[in-house]
Structure formats: structure tokens, C-alpha cells
Amino acid sequence: MTINLVPLLLSLITIFTIFNPSALADQSQIRSTTSQWLHFSEDLSQSTIEVSIPTIIAAVLSFFAASISSAGGIGGGGLFLSIMTIIAGLEMKTASSFSAFMVTGVSFANVGCNLFLRNPKSRDKTLIDFDLALTIQPCLLLGVSIGVICNRMFPNWLVLFLFAVFLAWSTMKTCKKGVSYWNLESERAKIKSPRDVDGIEVARSPLLSEEREDVRQRGMIRFPWMKLGVLVIIWLLFFSINLFRGNKYGQGIISIKPCGALYWFLSSLQIPLTIFFTLCIYFSDNVQSNHTSHSNQNSEQETGVGGRQNKLMLPVMALLAGVLGGLFGIGGGMLISPLLLQIGIAPEVTAATCSFMVLFSSSMSAIQYLLLGMEHAGTAAIFALVCFVASLVGLMVVKKVIAKYGRASIIVFAVGIVMALSTVLMTTHGAFNVWNDFVSGRYMGFKLPC
């Protein structure tokens, strides 16, 4: 019973923080100090947006979007971006910064709830698969950087076309995978033992289960602090490169000419870093054995992919997902989750691991936006807290539903719903923008990256 009250207490504390004027004042003071140190105080001239009907509607819709996204372990950036541009009426640049903060809020709540839970198939491991994260994260971050450059070069109509085609295909594959898991759970429920009164003991694979009590009874699980440390080092290295390099407007810790020789040199440093960490992880015996066990566990789902083949495929898949995520401006979580499901990773492990990786990428973007002087940072923080609370609520609801009905497949369906809504909303909004560019006679061809 105590475990169930933890998310509720976190929610109450968060709500108190949102509506506490002194807390907001402290946040403004911190932002002011940081911006003065970085000489970007002029960019924070307007820290909050005036409360209006569209803003309130956007907050309510963001709450529901975060609740659904948290179940699938994806950040929900596609939904947040659409809500902030269509409903709140923000410009795309401002909406992107808001989306980064909101995705960080969702992912932080998700990771906090899943960090010390047990893997349902490996009782001595955490629900978050750190081996998967180590294999995927370097290539995912590199792919995002490449995708951002491609986004500057490609015309809007091409980006929109690629976005619609790829997400429609991914949504279809995800929904099919969800149906497959649903049928598998139904078959397991039919052959359950008669002693299972509630009829869910065989099929249950909860995203949020009563594992913390189980941990107390059986002893602590082996938390991979070393692997977490490696991931933090990777995050810090990529973050430092992006922070020193700055953006295309020349905003950075040091003064660098946008798209100059030093700019591209710092950008290219991400390539050897990615190759180094990927090769080290690939030839790691510890990670290799864990991926082999993954393949053995998922053989009953007919993945047909060996452990070493999985390790070879995952970096390539992560690089592709990162490129597309950076190209579309939605991050890699919505793209990497369907790929992990397709190779047979369990839904609850996929959700927990994806939310962990999304936290790394979204927090990197959010901190860069903040340090480089974003507009309306106060309002963005409030929206992030709203999404944090919504994520906790969504996780509690999913926990109860899975525990009652034994349907972990609802995680897959949640991913499909978010992807379908994002595809429809962003494609529609993008189509109007492309049409406006066409009728106004704007240039619609390829551009230079600078």
C-alpha cells in the first residue's frame, strides 16, 4: 500500500510547486543568474506566457498526451509539438523548446518509477535494459545530430513526405505487433492453471508491479552502476560538444563562427566518439552474453535473430532512428520503440528502456535551450511539471490495468495510438505550411546547411 502512495505524493508535491509563487520566483532567479553568466540575459526578457484560453486548453491536452505516452515509454514529442503549434499558437522554434522540456518531464517520471524494478524474465536485472541502452545510445545521439543537419538542407515538402510514410508504416507494424502480443496473452490465459483464481497469473507482465516489496523479500537486484556511469559519460561528452559548438545562430559557450571550420570540427568529433564507444560495447563479453540471453528469451516469439546479429543490427537501427528523429524534430523514442518491439524485446522492457534513452536525449536538448537563452522558460517549466504529473498518473493507471487483466500488450497499443495521432496532426499541420510556401512563391528546393 505504501508503494502505491509514492506516485501520489510526488504528484501532490509537484502540483504545490506549480502553484507556489515563491517557487516560481526562485526558478526565475536561477535562470537570471545563469543567463547573466552566459551573457544571454536579453533572450530571457519574457520568461512566461500570459494565461489564456488556448494556453489552458494546450495544458489539458498535454496532460492527456503525457499520460498516454508514458505507458509506451516514448516521450510524446510529436503530440506536444502539434499541441503547442496548433492549439497554443507558438512558433515552431518556440514549440520545439517547449516540447523538449515536456518530454523531459514525462521521461523523468517514467525512469524514476522503473529504475529499480525487476525485469520479469531476469529476476536479478532491472526492468531498464542497460545493455540495450549502451548499444543504442551513442549511435542514436550521432543520428540526431546528422538528422538536424539534414533538416536544414531538405525542403519542407520532402521532410513531410518522409515523415508521413515512415510513421504510417511504423504505426501499422506496431499495431500488428500489439495484436500479436494480445493473441499470445489470450492463448496463455486459456492454458492457465485452475488454481489461478483471477486468471492473470500466467499472462501478467506488468509495467509497474509490486516489485519493490519483492526486492525487500529476496534481496536487492544487481544494479549496473558501471553501465550507468558509462552512459552518463557518453551524455556529458555529446552535451559538451554541442554546448561548445553552439547553434547555427552562433549562440554557444565560446564564440564560434556558425558553420566555420571549428564548428564542423567540433561536430565531426561525435563520429569517432560514437565509433569508439560502439566498438567497445560491441566486443564487451558482458554485454554480449546479456544480448544472447535476450535472444534466447525471445525465441518463443519467433524473432529469428541471434544475439550477435542483434548487436550488429541495433546500432544501425539506432543510427537510422536518430537521423529520422532529428530530421522530423521528434526525437528518437517514437522511432526506436517500434524497432525494438519488432526484434522481440518484451513490451515492458521496451517501454522502460526507451523512456530511459529519451531522458538522455531530451534533457540534453532542454538544458541547451535553457543555457543558450530560450524564451518563455518559466512557462516551459510549468508545462514540464504538468507532464511529469500526468506521466505518474498514466503509469499508475497502466499498472492497475495490467495487474487486473494481465495484458502487457496495452503498452504496444499505447505506442501505436501516440504514433497514429502524431502522424495525423503533424502531417496535417505540415501540409498547410507547405501549401502556404507554395502559394506565396517561396523557394522549395534543397538548401545549404548554413
UniProtKB/Swiss-Prot annotation:
Pfam families: TauE (PF01925). One of its GO terms (cellular component) is membrane. The chain crosses the membrane at residues 5-25, 48-68, 70-90, 97-117, 130-150, 153-173, 223-243, 261-281, 316-336, 340-360, 378-398, 408-428. Its main location: membrane. The keyword Iron-sulfur does not apply. It is a multi-pass membrane protein. This is Sulfite exporter TauE/SafE family protein 1. It comes from Arabidopsis thaliana (Mouse-ear cress). The lineage of its organism: Eukaryota, Viridiplantae, Streptophyta, Embryophyta, Tracheophyta.
